Amino acid sequence: MTETAKRPLYVPHAGPSLLEMPLLNKGSAFSTQERIDFNLQGLLPHNIETIEEQTERAYSQYNLCNTDLDRHIFLRSIQDNNETLFFRLLEEHLEEMMPIIYTPTVGQACQEFSKIYRTHRGLFISYPDRERIDDILRSATKNNVKIVVVTDSERILGLGDQGIGGMGIPIGKLSLYTACGGISPAYTLPVVLDVGTNNPDLLNDPMYMGWRHERVSGAQYEEFVDLFIQAIKRRWPNVLLQFEDFAQTNAMPLLERYKDELCCFNDDIQGTAAVAVGTLLAACKAKGEKLSEQTVTFVGAGSAGCGIAEQIIAAMQLEGLDEAQARRRIFMVDRWGLLTDDMSNLLDFQHRLAQKRADLGAWGGQQGDDLALLEVIRNARPTVLIGVSGQRGLFSEEVIRELHSHCKQPLVMPLSNPTSRVEATPQEILNWTDGQALVATGSPFQPVQVGDKRIPIAQCNNAYIFPGIGLGVIAARANRVTEGMLMAAANALANCSPIVTQGEGAVLPALGDIREVSKRIAVAVAKQAQAEGKALHTSDEVLNDAIEANFWFPRYRAYRRTSF
C-alpha cells in the first residue's frame, strides 16, 4: 500500500450527493463516524460492511444474471454507483469478467446502447455542438484527466457503424486501463464524437439517442475532429489520447496528422501491432528461431493488418534485415487476393506492403489475375498466418493443412472480433495440424483438448499492451508515444510468455498475471521514452517508485470532512 493510500481523503461533499458520486461512494462501507460527519445516517442500512463483504454480495448477484448482456449491464450499474467496488470485483474475477466488460459482450452492448442506457458516463460531443467543445470539456467532472479514449463509432469491432452506441468501447477500454494497468479511474475519460450515423437501423430506431443524421465526412469531418483535438490540448495539455475504432479511411490519416502534435496513439493500429509482434517474438523464442527468419501471410489488409505488418517489418530490421528484405517476407491478402503493385485500387498505406508482381512469375497466373489465399500459402510457404479480416471461416481446413504441410509448428493467429467473426476456431486449427500449431486468438477461447493434451489458448488481447503503455507514459510523464516505445512494449510482453519462461503453456501470460505484466511493460516503455528524449531521464529507482505510486488498487480510504 502506498503512503497516499494510507492517508485520509478530504471530501467536500456530503449527504445524498456523496452517495451519487461513483468515485467517492463507499455504500455500506462508510464507517459510523463518516456517516455522522457526512450526514449519511439513515441513508444507508445499519450494518457496516468491508469491501470484501460487498464484493461477495455483488458476485452472488452477478451469478443470478441469465445472459452475458445482463451481466454486462449489471457490472456497468455497479461501476456507475461505486467504482471502487466495481474494480475490486473485477480484480478478483478478471478472467471471468473481462469478456463481459469488453470483447465479445461489449459488441452487443454497443448495438443495444440506446435500449440499455441507464445514466451518463463520459462526454458525448455532437457535430451540431462543434462551436461549444471547450464548454463541453469544462463540463467534465474530472479535472485531472490523464487518459482520454475517443471514438467516432464508425468501425466498432467487426460490427461497423454503431453511432453513439460506440461509447461502450471507450468505457470498456478505460475499465481495462484501470483493471489491468492500475490507472486510477479518476484520471480517465471516455469520449464519443457524434458525427451522425449511416446505419439505417439506428436512423429508423425511435429509441436511438444520437444525432439523427447521416455521417459528416470529408473536410467537415476533419475540421470537427481538429476542433476537438485543439480543445483537448487546451483543457488537458499533457493527456494521453487514444484513438479507438475509427474507420480505416480516417484512422491512419488522423494518427499521422496528430502523432507529433500531442501524446496519442491508435490502439487498433499500434496496440494491435504491438501485441501481435509480442506474440510472434514469444513464439520465435520458444522455437529457437528469429523473427527475421519467418514468412508472414495476412488475411485482411486494412489499417489494423497493415499496422501489424509494418511493426513486424521494423522488428525484422532490428534483427539485421534491410527494409526490402523484410518486406519480401510479408504477404497481404484481402478480398481481391494478394496485394501486388499492379493493382489500381490500393489504399495509400497498402502500397508499401504490395508484392512486386514481377517477383511472382513462378507462381503462375497472368498479369492482373488475383492470387487467392490458398495459392499464396502454397507459394510463399509462410510460417505465420494472421487473420484480421472479420470473416468467419476464411482459414479453411485446406488452407491450414497446406500451411502445416511445409511448417511443422506454424503460428496461427485468427485475431478478428467478436467470436462469431473469427477466421477459424482454435479447435479447428489444432485438429487440422495434429495439435502442433501455436495458436493465439483475438477473442477468448477455452483450452482445447487434442488427444490426451489440454492446450491453453492465448488471447492476443490488446489489454496486454495498452494499459502498460498508459502506465508507463503517466509515470514517466512522456510527451509522445513512439514506435520505439511500442516495440519496447512488445519485447517486454514476449519476455513474460510462459512458453518462453517455463518452456510450456500458452504463448501469452495468463490474464490473472496481467497487472504484473503491465508493470513490466510500463518500465520498458518509460525507459524507452527517456532514451528517446520524450521524457526526463531518471534513475531506475525513481522510475520504479513512480510506477508504483501511480498504480491504483481498489481499496477504500478514510474520509475527512472539509469545505470547498
Swiss-Prot record:
Q: Which SMART domains match?
A: malic, Malic_M
Provide one Gene Ontology cellular component. cytosol
Instruction: Please state the Enzyme Commission number of this protein.
Output: 1.1.1.38
Active-site residue list: Y102, K173
Where does the record locate the signal sequence feature? none
UniProt remark on cofactor binding? Divalent metal cations. Prefers magnesium or manganese.
What Pfam families does the database record attribute to this sequence?
malic (PF00390), Malic_M (PF03949)
Coiled-coil parts of chain? none
Report if keyword Oxidoreductase is assigned.
yes
Q: Where does NAD(+) bind?
A: R155, D268, N417
Q: Name one GO molecular function term.
A: malate dehydrogenase (decarboxylating) (NAD+) activity
Matching entries from SUPFAM superfamilies are given as:
Aminoacid dehydrogenase-like, N-terminal domain (SSF53223), NAD(P)-binding Rossmann-fold domains (SSF51735)
The cofactor required is:
Mg(2+); Mn(2+)
Broadest EC class?
oxidoreductase
Task: Read off the Gene3D superfamilies from this record.
Answer: Malic enzyme, N-terminal domain, NAD(P)-binding Rossmann-like Domain
| Residues the entry annotates as binding a divalent metal cation | E244, D245, D268
Q: Which reaction does it catalyse?
A: (S)-malate + NAD(+) = pyruvate + CO2 + NADH; oxaloacetate + H(+) = pyruvate + CO2
Print the keywords alphabetically. Answer: Metal-binding, NAD, Oxidoreductase
Q: Where is this site: Important for activity?
A: D268
Q: Which InterPro entries match?
A: Aminoacid_DH-like_N_sf, Malic_enzyme_CS, Malic_N_dom, Malic_N_dom_sf, Malic_NAD-bd, Malic_OxRdtase, NAD(P)-bd_dom_sf, NAD_malic_enz_proteobac
Protein family per UniProt: Belongs to the malic enzymes family.
Subunit info here reads:
Homotetramer.
The protein depicted here goes by the name NAD-dependent malic enzyme
